């Protein structure tokens, strides 16, 4: 059974890593970043829940008048 020649593996792996690095650098360099990011104004409007829109009175058994 012939021996597997691994002498070219190191140059193959190094060239693959360099190629991936260059490709990712080119992809990232095409992305446009905002020059001066500013925070958005977060004005939240308070939304009323259905039970907050109208007045309701809750009667618990202990608050009922005694008979």
Swiss-Prot record:
* Gene Ontology CC entries for this record: mitochondrial membrane; proton-transporting ATP synthase complex
Record key words, sorted: Acetylation, ATP synthesis, CF(0), Hydrogen ion transport, Ion transport, Membrane, Mitochondrion, Transmembrane, Transmembrane helix, Transport
* Purpose of the protein: Mitochondrial membrane ATP synthase (F(1)F(0) ATP synthase or Complex V) produces ATP from ADP in the presence of a proton gradient across the membrane which is generated by electron transport complexes of the respiratory chain. F-type ATPases consist of two structural domains, F(1) - containing the extramembraneous catalytic core and F(0) - containing the membrane proton channel, linked together by a central stalk and a peripheral stalk. During catalysis, ATP synthesis in the catalytic domain of F(1) is coupled via a rotary mechanism of the central stalk subunits to proton translocation.
- Name recorded for this polypeptide: ATP synthase protein 8
Q: Report the InterPro entries cross-referenced here.
A: ATP8_mammal (IPR039017), ATP8_metazoa (IPR001421)
Topology relative to the lipid bilayer, per the entry, is: Single-pass membrane protein
Oligomeric state and interaction partners are given as: F-type ATPases have 2 components, CF(1) - the catalytic core - and CF(0) - the membrane proton channel. Component of an ATP synthase complex composed of ATP5PB, ATP5MC1, ATP5F1E, ATP5PD, ATP5ME, ATP5PF, ATP5MF, MT-ATP6, MT-ATP8, ATP5F1A, ATP5F1B, ATP5F1D, ATP5F1C, ATP5PO, ATP5MG, ATP5MK and ATP5MJ. Interacts with PRICKLE3.
Chief subcellular location equals mitochondrion
Q: Name one GO biological process term.
A: proton motive force-driven ATP synthesis
Annotated membrane-spanning segments are 8-24
Q: Where in the cell is it found?
A: Mitochondrion membrane
Q: Which Pfam families match?
A: ATP-synt_8
Which residues are recorded as modified (N6-acetyllysine)? 54, 57
Q: What are the N6-succinyllysine sites (modified residues) in this protein? A: 54
**Which GO molecular function entries does the Swiss-Prot or TrEMBL record give?**
proton transmembrane transporter activity
Family note: Belongs to the ATPase protein 8 family.
């Amino acid at each position: 059974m012939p021996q597997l020649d691994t002498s070219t593996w190191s140059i193959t792996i190094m060239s693959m890593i360099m190629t991936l690095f260059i490709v990712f650098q080119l992809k990232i360099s095409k992305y446009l970043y905002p020059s001066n990011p500013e925070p958005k104004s977060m004005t939240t409007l308070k939304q009323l829940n259905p039970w907050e829109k109208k007045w309701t009175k809750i009667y618990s058994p202990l608050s009922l008048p005694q008979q």
